[in-house]
From Swiss-Prot:
Gene this chain is encoded by: aat
Any one Gene Ontology BP term: protein catabolic process
EC number(s) recorded for this UniProt protein: 2.3.2.6
Signal sequence residues: none
Full protein name: Leucyl/phenylalanyl-tRNA--protein transferase
PANTHER family according to UniProt: LEUCYL/PHENYLALANYL-TRNA--PROTEIN TRANSFERASE (PTHR30098), LEUCYL_PHENYLALANYL-TRNA--PROTEIN TRANSFERASE (PTHR30098:SF2)
The protein's enzyme class: transferase
Alphabetic keyword roster: Acyltransferase, Cytoplasm, Transferase
Localisation per UniProt entry: Cytoplasm
Catalytic activity entry: N-terminal L-lysyl-[protein] + L-leucyl-tRNA(Leu) = N-terminal L-leucyl-L-lysyl-[protein] + tRNA(Leu) + H(+); N-terminal L-arginyl-[protein] + L-leucyl-tRNA(Leu) = N-terminal L-leucyl-L-arginyl-[protein] + tRNA(Leu) + H(+); L-phenylalanyl-tRNA(Phe) + an N-terminal L-alpha-aminoacyl-[protein] = an N-terminal L-phenylalanyl-L-alpha-aminoacyl-[protein] + tRNA(Phe)
InterPro entries referenced in this protein's UniProt entry, alphabetically: Acyl_CoA_acyltransferase, Leu/Phe-tRNA_Trfase, Leu/Phe-tRNA_Trfase_C
GO cellular component, one term: cytoplasm
Coiled-coil positions: none
Length: 191
């Protein structure tokens, strides 16, 4: 199937995101409230995770195994990442928009975060882990990276209890779109 990458990026740039429904039909979705991961002092994580970080059990990589991260994110009992959406992520990756931020333990992929980068916006699509704490370490290290690269926002789309532990917060759609417009003017890069 042919996909128009420019149209897909335009959809994300307007504040929408792709998801497949229970019948694997792909569609654009929006939200009245959007969840952001703070890139300032509001970002936090459990003290137990600090011990894991201090042990340096994991190394970090970007795009070392993009396909494995997409597969890991999609490999759930109930998933919104259809086969078609996996193909779109691959095309977005090949054109420089989709990234995998990964943690590794030796030669084993421990966890990762799948995201789309447009200007100074990192749009987190999904995350997974194979080794306990793998995705949590990825979250901390990704926030550090986004800060270093002067990103404007880390969009997590929808709130869940896991994200709340990192200081995630909701903003109204109007405020989100204003922040997104600012992010789109930025020339930040992940790599």
């Amino acid at each position: 199937m042919q996909y128009d990458i420019a149209s897909i990026i335009q959809g994300y740039a307007q504040g929408y995101f792709l998801m497949a429904d229970d019948n694997d039909c792909l569609g654009w979705y929006g939200s009245r409230d959007r969840t952001l991961i703070p890139l300032d002092e509001r970002f936090r994580y459990p003290k137990s995770l600090q011990r894991v970080l201090n042990q340096e059990r994991f190394t970090v990589a970007i795009n070392r195994d993009f396909a494995a991260v997409v597969a890991g994110c999609a490999n759930r009992e109930s998933t919104w990442i259809s086969q078609e959406l996996q193909e779109i992520y691959w095309l977005l990756h090949q054109t420089g928009y989709a990234y995998s931020f990964e943690t590794w333990q030796g030669e084993e992929l421990a966890g990762g975060i799948l995201g789309i980068v447009i200007g100074g916006a990192f749009i987190g699509e999904s995350m997974f882990y194979r080794i306990p704490e793998g995705s949590k370490v990825a979250m901390v290290k990704l926030v550090e990276r986004l800060r270093q690269r002067e990103f404007v926002m880390f969009d997590a789309q929808m709130m869940n209890p896991h994200l709340e532990r990192f200081g995630a917060y909701r903003i109204k759609d109007k405020e989100y779109k204003t922040l997104l417009e600012k992010a789109l003017l930025s020339s930040s890069t992940l790599i």
